[in-house]
A protein has these predicted regions:
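Conserved phosphate-binding elements of NTP-dependent enzyme cores
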Residues: 1-280, 285
Length: 287
């Protein structure tokens, strides 16, 4: 990247090696985000994704032709309604629905996997339409989500909840911490692979059906990272992460870096924005 001059940058030239983990550090206001977000990210979004974005001033960006994909793992919410949750975002709900649709009780009742979708009218709670909550508009105050009186937050109707796997309904599964779900689905490889990835990024304490609008920025970011890891990588993807270690314990930071290294080992490139060297174990990255 040549001649980056956005905001307080002054004709900055920088080279990021492909196929490695790169880290950009500096105190607040030093220009990290100007360099990587305003210039690099937006320029690549415009060139690779045809997005209409305002790009920070620069002369030229070379070498991006060798990349096939751009993924920005930021702290923006995964959604603003109870339908957006770890199970739906990582798509682990799909094989879980497959499994419930194959249970003997489901077959006896003529249910298919569709019955276990939030969007299936025949299977969901009719009062809250599968959200488990109702939105109360407060007009001059922030709107409030309150638990559905009819399903008590369980999302599905009584007939759907008659189907169980190892004694657990699909509502029980969504109300289950990821670590517990790993134990429940230990015999189901498709489901287990995604759940273990969520554990690896330090989200084992989170419930599978936890509403996306209750997640912190850091949790949303790690959830997005887990979703990427659970997909089969084709390599040649650039990942940009803005301060992913914020609020993490040192053990969680080490775990996160190992996960990022896995992406790099698959032929991808990572660029991380960090405030300080002390927040990262930099021997795993490219100085």
């Amino acid at each position: 990247m040549l001649g980056a001059s956005a905001n307080n940058l002054k004709e900055v030239d920088v080279r990021f090696p492909l196929g490695l983990m790169n880290v950009v550090t500096g105190v607040s206001g030093s220009g990290k985000s100007s360099l990587l977000v305003d210039v690099l990210q937006r320029a690549l979004e415009k060139k690779m994704l045809d997005k209409r974005v305002e790009v920070g001033k620069h002369q030229e960006i070379k070498g991006y032709e060798k990349l096939e994909q751009l993924m920005v793992i930021d702290q923006e919410p995964i959604g603003r309604t109870p339908r957006s949750n770890p199970a739906t975002y990582t798509k682990v709900l799909d094989p879980i629905r497959d499994l419930f649709g194959k249970m003997n009780e489901a077959r006896r009742r003529g249910f298919t996997k569709r019955r276990f979708s939030f969007n299936a009218r025949e299977g969901r709670c009719g009062a809250c339409e599968g959200q488990g909550y109702h939105l109360i508009e407060m007009h001059f105050l922030s709107d409030v989500w309150v638990t559905c009186d009819q399903c008590k937050g369980r999302r599905y109707n009584r007939e759907t909840l008659a189907v169980t796997f190892r004694g657990q309904t699909i509502a029980d599964v969504l109300d289950m911490e990821i670590t517990k779900a790993v134990e429940l689905f230990e015999s189901q490889p498709r489901i287990l692979r995604i759940l273990q990835t969520l554990e690896e990024v330090g989200l084992g304490y989170m419930k599978l059906g936890q509403s996306g609008n209750t997640l912190s920025g850091g949790e949303a970011q790690r959830l997005k990272l887990a979703a990427e890891l659970s997909r089969r990588s084709r390599g040649k993807t650039l990942y940009i992460l803005d301060e992913p270690t914020t609020g993490l314990h040192i053990d969680d930071v080490a775990r996160l870096l190992k996960i990022l290294q896995r992406l790099v080992d698959q032929g991808n490139t990572a660029i991380i924005i960090a405030v300080s060297y002390t927040h990262l174990t930099l021997p795993t990255s490219n100085d």
